[in-house]
């Protein structure tokens, strides 16, 4: 049986080595997030200040996988 994951939205606050990021969730929690393989394969750039969707395990709520970078409303891309 597959483990249930919780999906949250948050803001990248800090970039760490090896594709890791500090993410502040909308509920105020700080989570250590790593980039999913699909984002890495598509060469999607994630920078501090970006809004992302992050998948967090129910068993370890301090780490998560970044699964989507949300588009900024004011950007031209």
Swiss-Prot record:
Protein's UniProt keywords contain Translocase: no
Record's subunit section: Component of the 30S ribosomal translation pre-initiation complex which assembles on the 30S ribosome in the order IF-2 and IF-3, IF-1 and N-formylmethionyl-tRNA(fMet); mRNA recruitment can occur at any time during PIC assembly.
Protein name as catalogued: Translation initiation factor IF-1, chloroplastic
Gene that encodes the chain: infA
Ranges of residues in domain S1-like: 1-71
GO molecular function annotations of the record: ribosome binding; rRNA binding; translation initiation factor activity
UniProt entry keywords in alphabetical sequence: Chloroplast, Initiation factor, Plastid, Protein biosynthesis, RNA-binding, rRNA-binding
Protein family per UniProt: Belongs to the IF-1 family.
Species for this entry: Amborella trichopoda
């Amino acid at each position: 049986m597959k483990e249930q994951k919780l999906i949250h939205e948050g803001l990248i606050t800090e970039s760490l080595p090896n594709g890791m990021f500090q993410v502040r969730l909308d509920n105020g929690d700080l989570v250590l997030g790593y980039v999913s393989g699909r984002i890495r394969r598509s060469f999607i750039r994630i920078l501090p200040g970006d809004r992302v969707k992050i998948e967090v395990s129910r068993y370890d709520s301090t780490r998560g996988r970044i699964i989507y970078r949300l588009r900024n409303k004011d950007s031209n891309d």
